């Protein structure tokens, strides 16, 4: 059955069962006849726009607008606003709805909620941003006009764990393969905030930060020495054909890269930023025994009572080790930007630790590097790099 036929049958059913005076008698009319009567003013009982909503239900765009209206209304109760934000977040999990936020001018009010006085509202707003930009290059670019990076970095100062965690979640989605967002992040010295997050009392935030650092290294085409290069794919290239096209063959579609990679903005040099901000030193120190480090490099303990050793958290240790190994792949044989003696000594101390026994005596691995899930080939490359320093 066609969509038009479905619409006609549905409207007829609604008219027949509406209970309005004189409506049921017109149920046998076509949609075209009824529409003509409405336009001519002969059917005021059907001119109410709420009738369509009653029959068909509200569109998701309407629901988004209504939920956002409640969320930004400071006269409403906090539970009402939180429910509205939760509903809005579920709606924009659908990528088309997330992209509609731009045409519906919803980005500005959502970004403004990041500075709301209520931590719960801040958390929900950051969650919405993170969900909207997740694997969505169009949303990643659209939101940049509203300067979300600065607002999200500010939230990393929050005393509320969940606010900081959701801010990091949103940042991770926003910065993913996005040189324009990375440029904003770099200009705002976001590296300093990442360094602080690596020693956050909340171990969950440390894990998220280490994971993000590794992701930024992996997406960066630069080595430690290279100048930032544009990652633009703005020029569309058609696949090359080695046989003459037949007259009936359709033209080959042009390849179009993600919106985030269609700018001429160069990706910042992540490896160099990690050195200049001391993030690499913080990462390495997090995997070394505290008693072997100077006070300035010893990471604070974690846990509710401040008595937990982050090295014993396998998830955090694995993510930190992965980021460190990725960093070493960026080191050229003879770097023109040599590492300072402190960083070199930390690398050599880490090599010793990774070759030692696992921290968990029940782990079947024979070495710390195997305990952290590092492949033998990758560890050999790491060892070669460190010996060359």
Curated annotation (Swiss-Prot):
This is Hsp70 nucleotide exchange factor FES1. Residues 223-255 are annotated as: Disordered. GO terms for biological process: regulation of translation. PANTHER family: HSP70-BINDING PROTEIN 1 (PTHR19316:SF18), PROTEIN FOLDING REGULATOR (PTHR19316). Functions as a nucleotide exchange factor (NEF) for Hsp70 chaperones which accelerates the release of ADP. Required for fully efficient Hsp70-mediated folding of proteins. Belongs to the FES1 family. It is found in: Cytoplasm. Residues 242-253 have a biased composition (Pro residues). It comes from the Eukaryota. GO terms for molecular function: adenyl-nucleotide exchange factor activity. Pfam families: Fes1. The gene is FES1. InterPro entries: ARM-like (IPR011989), ARM-type_fold (IPR016024), Hsp70_NEF-Inhibitors (IPR050693), Nucleotide_exch_fac_Fes1 (IPR013918). ARM repeats lie at residues 95-134, 137-176, 179-218, 268-310. GO terms for cellular component: endoplasmic reticulum. Signal peptide: none annotated. Keywords: Cytoplasm, Repeat, Translation regulation.
């Amino acid at each position: 059955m066609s969509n038009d036929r479905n619409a006609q049958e549905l409207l007829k059913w609604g008219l027949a069962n509406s209970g309005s005076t004189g409506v049921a008698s017109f149920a046998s009319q076509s949609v075209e006849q009824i529409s003509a009567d409405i336009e001519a003013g002969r059917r005021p009982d059907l001119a109410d726009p709420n009738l369509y909503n009653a029959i068909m239900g509200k569109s998701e765009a309407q629901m988004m607008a209504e939920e956002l209206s409640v969320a930004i209304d400071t006269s409403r109760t906090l539970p009402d606003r939180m429910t509205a934000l939760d509903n809005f977040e579920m709606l924009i999990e659908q990528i088309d709805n997330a992209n509609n936020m731009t045409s519906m001018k919803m980005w500005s009010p959502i970004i403004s909620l990041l500075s709301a006085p209520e931590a719960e509202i801040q958390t929900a707003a950051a969650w919405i941003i993170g969900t909207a930009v997740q694997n969505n290059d169009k949303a990643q670019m659209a939101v940049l006009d509203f300067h979300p990076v600065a607002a999200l970095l500010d939230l990393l100062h929050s005393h509320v764990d969940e606010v900081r965690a959701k801010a990091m979640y949103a940042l991770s989605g926003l910065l993913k393969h996005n040189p324009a967002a990375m440029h904003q992040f770099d200009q705002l010295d976001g590296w300093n905030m990442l360094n602080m997050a690596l020693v956050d009392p909340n171990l969950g935030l440390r894990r998220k930060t280490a994971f993000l650092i590794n992701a930024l290294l992996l997406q960066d085409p630069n080595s430690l020495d290279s100048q930032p290069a544009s990652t633009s794919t703005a020029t569309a290239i058609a696949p090359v054909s080695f046989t003459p096209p037949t007259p009936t063959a359709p033209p080959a579609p042009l390849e179009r890269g993600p919106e985030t990679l269609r700018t001429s903005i160069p990706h910042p040099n992540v490896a160099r930023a990690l050195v200049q901000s001391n993030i690499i030193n913080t990462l390495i120190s997090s995997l070394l025994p505290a008693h072997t480090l100077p006070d300035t490099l010893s990471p604070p303990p974690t846990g509710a009572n401040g008595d937990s050793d982050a090295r014993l958290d396998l998830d955090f240790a694995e993510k930190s080790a992965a980021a460190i190994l990725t960093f070493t792949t960026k080191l050229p044989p003879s770097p023109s930007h040599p590492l300072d003696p402190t960083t070199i000594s930390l690398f050599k101390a880490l090599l010793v630790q990774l070759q030692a026994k696992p921290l968990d005596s029940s782990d079947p691995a024979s070495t710390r590097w195997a305990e952290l899930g590092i492949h033998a080939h990758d560890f050999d490359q790491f060892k070669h790099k460190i010996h060359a320093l």
